[in-house]
A protein has these predicted regions:
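Short beta-strand/loop segment that forms part of the nucleotide-sugar
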Residues: 30-44, 61-63
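A conserved acidic beta->alpha catalytic loop
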Residues: 39-50, 94
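Short beta-strand-to-loop element that shapes/binds the nucleotide-sugar donor at the catalytic cleft/hinge
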Residues: 112-126
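Conserved donor nucleotide-binding strand/loop of the catalytic core
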Residues: 50-82
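Short, well-formed alpha-helical segments that are part of the catalytic scaffolds
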Residues: 11-28
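Acidic donor-binding loop at a coil-to-helix junction in glycosyltransferase catalytic cores
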Residues: 168-174
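A recurrent flexible, glycine/aromatic-enriched loop bordering the glycosyltransferase active site
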Residues: 119, 134-152
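Acidic donor-binding/catalytic loop of UDP-sugar-dependent glycosyltransferases
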Residues: 48, 90-106
Length: 231
């Protein structure tokens, strides 16, 4: 069984789109009928995230950690108890392509690290995507770690102790421990998971803060150009 874990804290605006994309990926013919279970960790949610999950018949559980690392770890533990042999991780504001799970299994490695892109639905988000694409590394061997596009075998996950209860960087921490333990890691340039362009995220120091930092850097560079007359 493949287990898909999704941490969520007040994600009513995006969780439906995320789960529908996961359900489509779970039906991909490349999985050859392998069972897929999706679990959403409702971490201190006060909006309608839980109701949307129920409408889509997706399993959930509640916790009050307010910590993305703890939420991922709890969801992973739940899936392992249910017999998962592979754990796939994404974020509640992400959208996965149909071949996402099949590609992770096809990699035939202990861990799968994929890339992400930023959704562009308006002028601001298109600008953010351009900034992100300038800074991101693409293609196989990229060396990036994103919790929104991550997979690991149950055996390798257990061997290194799983996700740590970190408020940020739990994905990077896990992959570092996997690499140190000699696990094989597939740094895949495809498939790409699309994530939101929001600048106010759920975890301090997370992806939204990274995007906000890119915006500030660009604004600072523009200001310098104006002052020096080089822009």
């Amino acid at each position: 069984m493949i287990g898909v874990l999704v941490p969520a804290h007040d994600e009513a605006a995006t969780i439906g789109r995320c789960l529908r994309s996961l359900q489509k990926a779970a039906r991909h013919p490349g999985l050859n009928g392998c069972e897929v279970r999706i679990v959403v960790a409702l971490d201190a949610c006060s909006d309608s995230t839980a109701a949307i999950c129920r409408e889509l018949q997706v399993e959930t559980f509640d916790l009050q950690a307010r910590c993305v690392g703890a939420a991922r770890a709890a969801a992973a533990a739940r899936l392992l108890q249910q017999g998962a042999r592979w754990l796939a991780s994404t974020d509640a504001d992400g959208t996965v392509p149909p071949q996402w799970l099949a590609a992770q299994l096809d990699a035939r490695s202990d861990a799968f690290c994929g890339v992400v892109d930023v959704a562009a639905s308006g002028r601001r988000s298109r600008h953010l995507r351009r900034l992100f694409r300038r800074s991101e590394r693409w293609g196989d061997g990229h060396g990036r770690v994103h919790g929104a596009n991550l997979g690991v075998s149950a055996q390798a996950y257990r061997a290194v102790g799983g996700f740590a209860a970190l408020g940020c960087g739990e994905d990077v921490d896990l992959v570092r421990r996997l690499s140190a333990a000699g696990a094989s890691v597939r740094w895949a340039g495809a498939p790409v998971v699309t994530t939101s362009a929001r600048l106010l995220g759920r975890a301090r120091g997370g992806f939204a803060d990274y995007l906000a930092g890119l915006t500030l850097e660009q604004q600072s560079a523009s200001a310098v150009c104006q002052l020096t007359g080089t822009g």
